[in-house]
Amino acid sequence: MSDIALTVSILALVAVVGLFIGNVKFRGIGLGIGGVLFGGIIVGHFVSQAGMTLSSDMLHVIQEFGLILFVYTIGIQVGPGFFASLRVSGLRLNLFAVLIVIIGGLVTAILHKLFDIPLPVVMGIFSGAVTNTPALGAGQQILRDLGTPMEMVDQMGMSYAMAYPFGICGILFTMWMLRVIFRVNVETEAQQHESSRTNGGALIKTINIRVENPNLHDLAIKDVPILNGDKIICSRLKREETLKVPSPDTIIQLGDLLHLVGQPADLHNAQLVIGQEVDTSLSTKGTDLRVERVVVTNENVLGKRIRDLHFKERYDVVISRLNRAGVELVASGDISLQFGDILNLVGRPSAIDAVANVLGNAQQKLQQVQMLPVFIGIGLGVLLGSIPVFVPGFPAALKLGLAGGPLIMALILGRIGSIGKLYWFMPPSANLALRELGIVLFLSVVGLKSGGDFVNTLVNGEGLSWIGYGALITAVPLITVGILARMLAKMNYLTMCGMLAGSMTDPPALAFANNLHPTSGAAALSYATVYPLVMFLRIITPQLLAVLFWSIG
C-alpha cells in the first residue's frame, strides 16, 4: 500500500474511532467532536508501535486545510450577524476574553518561576493548554530567533502534545461544571438569546394604533416624520371595515387603525405621537390582502436597496420585516438585499406574486452551493493570514495565520453578502457538512501526531507534571472568568460557552457548545465575536513571555 493510501486509511480509522468515542455519553455529557483527538492519540500510539510510516507532508496539508474549512464556514455562518453583535455586546465579550488571556499568562509566569520549568517546555504547555497551534508556531519561531538549541525547541512540541488533550477536556469540563453550578436550563437560555437577537438588541414587535392626534388628520404618511423614517414600517391601514396596504401618499384620518412594525422603544414613541394601542385585529383573513414570506434569490436584485426597488409604488406591496441569517430586522429603505434574505410581504395576491418573481423566491437555489465564492474566500483568507505585521522590539513578524485569516475574511464576506453575481450565502446543511469535515480532519492529524510518544512521555518522563501544569493554565482562567461572567454580568450560558471557546481559540469546544442546542447560533456568534482579537493576543503572548523570561532568566 502506498504512503498516501495508508495515510488516508489511517485517518479514516481515526475518524471512526474518535466519533464513536465522542458519541459515548455519561449522564448526558459526551466529548462530541472532541473525541476525534483521543481517537487519534489511540490510533497514533499503535501506528507508532507497528512501525508504520505515514506521509508527514500529507498530514500537514490535511491538518491545515481542515482547520481552514472549519473557521471559514464558521465565519460565513455568523458573518451577517457578527458586526451587529459586536456593536451590542462585543465590548463586554472581548473584555472577558482578554481577561482569560491575561490570567493564563500570569499563571504560566508563576509556574515557570515556582517550578523552574525550562522555557521551551513551559511555552509548549501554555500553547497546548490554550489549544492554540499558531501560538506553538510563534513560540518556536521566537525561540529560534533567540538562539535556543533545536533540541530544546523540539521539546516545545512534546509539551504542547501533553497539555493539548486536557486543554480540550478542561474547557468542556468547565462548561459542564458551570452548567451544574448555576443549574442552567439550556432550552430556556436558547429562548432568552433568541428573544434578544436583532440589529439593535431588541425584539422586533408589531402594534395596532388608532390615530387620535388631530394634527395628523388629512396628512399623507410621508409627511409624518415618525412614519416616514427607517425605524418603523406601516404595513396595513384599516378605515372602518376596509383594510389596505398604505403607500407614502396615503392620507390618514382620525380613527384610522395602523399596523406598525418596529422595535419596542420606537413603537412607544409612535404611540406618543399618533394615539393609543388597540386590541382590534388587522388580520388579512377574510380580506383581499395576504401576508407571505418570500426569499431573495434573483441575482439582479442583490445589493440593491429596498427603496430603489419601489415595491410600494409599483405593486402596492409593503415589506414589513426582513430576516437575515436568523436575525429579524426592520425593513428600512436603506437596507441592501442579500442572497437568502427572507422578506415579509403584505399586499394583494397578484401583486405579491409579481414581487416574488422580481425577488426570485426560488427555493431550490437555497440548496445549491456556489463553489467559486467558497474558494475565492478561502484564498483571500489565506493571503490575509500570511501578511506579516512587524512590531518594533519583536524579533519575529506577527501573522493571523491559516486560522485567523480565513475567519476574518469569511466574516467580512458573510457581512457583504454578494459582489455582483457572486454571493457568499451557504445552505445550512452544506455549511455544517464542510464544518464537521474540517474539524474531524484537523483533530485526526493532531491526535495522530501526539499519539506516537504520548504514552512513553506520560509514563516514563515528566508527562504527568506537564499535564498538571497545563491543567492549571487551562482551568484557572476559564473557571474564574466563567463564574464572574455568569454572576456579575448575568451572561447567557450559551453565549458564555461560545466566549470561553473563542477565548481558547478552540474549535472542538465550539463544536461542543454548538451541540448543547443545535438550533441556536448563540455560541457560534460569541465565538466569532471574540476570536479575531483573542487569536492576535494568543499569537503575541508566547512571544511576550519568551522575551520576558529570556531577559530575566
Curated annotation (Swiss-Prot):
Compartment annotation: Cell membrane
CC terms in the record's Gene Ontology section: plasma membrane
Stretches that traverse the bilayer: 4-24, 28-48, 65-85, 95-115, 158-178, 371-391, 393-413, 439-459, 464-484, 493-513, 533-553
Pfam families recorded: Asp-Al_Ex (PF06826), TrkA_C (PF02080)
InterPro entries assigned to the protein according to its UniProt record, in alphabetical order: AAE_transporter, RCK_C, RCK_C_sf, Transpt_YidE_put, YidE_YbjL
Disulfide bonds: none
Keyword Cell membrane: yes
Keywords noted in UniProt: Cell membrane, Membrane, Repeat, Transmembrane, Transmembrane helix, Transport
Domain RCK C-terminal stretches: 191-276, 279-361
Membrane topology: Multi-pass membrane protein
PROSITE patterns xrefs: RCK_C
One GO molecular-function entry: monoatomic cation transmembrane transporter activity
GO BP annotation list: potassium ion transport
NCBIfam families noted in UniProt: PRK03818.1, YidE_YbjL_dupl
Family statement: Belongs to the AAE transporter (TC 2.A.81) family. YidE subfamily.
Protein name per UniProt: Putative transport protein YidE
Organism: Shigella boydii serotype 18 (strain CDC 3083-94 / BS512)
Organism taxonomic ancestry: Bacteria, Pseudomonadati, Pseudomonadota, Gammaproteobacteria, Enterobacterales
Originating gene: yidE
